[in-house]
Structure formats: structure tokens, C-alpha cells
Amino acid sequence: MALLKVKFNQKKRVKLAQGLWLMNWFSVFAGIIVFSMGLFLKIELRKRSEVMDNSESHFVPNSLILMGILSCAFNGFAGKICYDSLDPAKFAKWKPLLKPYLALCFFFNILLFFVALICFLMRGSLESTLAQGLKNSMKFYRDTDTPGRCFMKKTIDMLQIEFKCCGNNGFKDWFEIQWISNRYLDFSSKEVKDRIKSNVDGRYLVDGVPFSCCNPSSPRPCIQYQVTNNSAHYSYDYQTEELNLWGRGCREALLHYYSSMMSSMGAVVLLVWLFEMSVMVGLRLLHTSLESIANPEDPECESEGWILENSLKDTLKSALESLKKIGKFNQVEAGAEGAEGEEAGKTPAITTVS
């Protein structure tokens, strides 16, 4: 029994073809939106590439760009088929291509669905990329005189100001690295010497943070040095008082920014996928309704359209049998080639009589 069998007359077939033509051009527009989202996400990720550990995060935007291009190509082609299906003479040239095209559409929709899922599932990978990337970037904050790293101070400062964050996981991350360049340290000072000697790696560590960690909304002037020294500041207790530094780490801030963006994009891609599935189903109904016309010379006659010629169970069974036959045929061919090779390798023995 056919799955989703529908009866069509000429009027219904024309309406279906016209509706599908319109839907395909809407799908082309949806493909442009998916392409644009991928391009936008790629640009946003490139802006912060210095604070990311690897290029794996670009898999999502690259996938969106590819799906957008394929969507425009497939739906533009389908729109042409639907337009020509109103004319039997024009439709005849497309008829042999419809089955392979529908198979390609099916695989395209599977890929589109997986891309939508990846948009929701990339959070874990993105988190580890940001955590390691920010950690490495903060180490280079002081290298303002080193070629290739001189821009890192500005990058980190602008990042902390824009996203209202401080450090990787919090402001205390700055206590663990030397973020002040040796160029600006007075090595004749006893305090500087003592701090460097007290550190195993010979680094100048302070309980201070860069100016970009300061919250301008705080009524108190920014305390960015001796943050944990209560006696260094009047009426101050860093453990109980709300600090005038950003409390959120930049990893969390960036992760929230990109995750919310990708989740929104994933929702849009899912909607596009549902629309693409409805277009594919409609195109299959149009294809089968035109193929099942009893008398091609009488376009007014009724016909039947369906999604699957047999039930889902029977279709899967026949598909598995076809795959088994292909596998057996390949084995037989391989065996025949092997036998031919063995025969060719045998050379006839020639006996000479003296």
C-alpha cells in the first residue's frame, strides 16, 4: 500500500506545481539567510581568533555557508522543474532527472538537520577552545614590544571593555601571570627585586589587574592594584565588598555570546529544514502524479501521487535487498577477476626432446 496516496486532477496538479514553484523561491531566500548567518558567524569568530585555541570553531559557519549555497542551487533547480511541469513537452526533458534529484534532496535534508543539531551541540568544544585560547592570550598581554604579539594588549583590553569581563574565569587569573612588561619595571627598586626573587619562574606577579577590568559604573575610584590588601585602601574589604572590577570571566562572557548566537541560528536552520522537507514531499507528490497519468495525451485525466510506492516497512526491506544484491554482485566480480588473474599467471610448460 502506497504511503500518503493522493488523487489529483489537472486543476490540482497545476495548483501544486504553482505552489511548489513559489515555495522553492522562498527556499532560495531561506538559503540566502542561512548563507548570511554562516558568513556573519565566521566574521564574528575571526574578530576573536586571537583568543581562540584552534580553528575547529569555524566548522559551524563553514557548514552554514555550504548549506546556504546548496539550498539556493537545489531550490532554484526545483523551481525551474515546477515551472516546466505545467508544459508536458518541457517536463519530458526533466523526467529522467527527477528521481536522482529527489535522492540528492533527501541527503541534503539529512545534512541540513545535522548542521542544525551541531549549532546546539558546539558549546562544549567552544568552551575548551576559549578557555585555552584566553589563557595563552593573557600570557602575551605584556609583549607590547614583541613582533606578532604587540597587538595582544589592545585586543584583551577591548575584549574586557566590550564584554564587561575580567580574566579567563575571573579577575584573580591576572594574579597568576606577569602582565606588566619588563620594560616598565624599575629593576633597581627593592620591591621589584624581591617580587621577582620570591617567584620560582622569576616573574613579577602582583595582585593587580589591567585598567580594562574596571567597572565604570562603580561609585568608587577603580582599585586595580593591591586588590586583596584591605589595609592599602580606606574602608575596604575585598571579600565582603562588591568590587569595582568586572566579576565575570571573559570565557563565560564569550561562551554565552557565541552559544546564544549559534542556538538562534540552529533554530532558524531547523525551521528552514522543516520548510525544505515540505518542499521535497510536495515535489515527490508532483513527480508521482505526473508519472501515473494513464493517458499522457489527455492532460485532463486523473492520476495518483504518493510519497512511497509501498509501505515504509516494504520500502526499507526492498532497499536492504538491493544493497545485498549489489554486495553479492561485487563479490562475484572480484572472484571472477581473481580467477582470471590466476589463469593468466599460469604459463604452459614446454618439453623439449633431444
UniProtKB/Swiss-Prot annotation:
The residues the entry assigns to the signal sequence are none
Kindly report every residue range on the membrane side named Lumenal. Answer: 44-61, 124-264
| Membrane topology qualifier | Multi-pass membrane protein
The annotated subunit structure for this chain is: Homodimer; disulfide-linked.
Please report the name of this protein according to its UniProt entry: Peripherin-2
What are the recorded GO MF terms, alphabetically? protein homodimerization activity
Its biological purpose is as follows: May be involved in the morphogenesis of retina outer segment disks and the development and maintenance of the retina ultrastructure.
Q: Where is this region: Disordered?
A: 335-354
Give a Pfam family name: Tetraspanin
**Does Nucleotide-binding count among this protein's keywords?**
no
Answer yes or no on keyword Disulfide bond.
yes
Q: What is its main location?
A: membrane
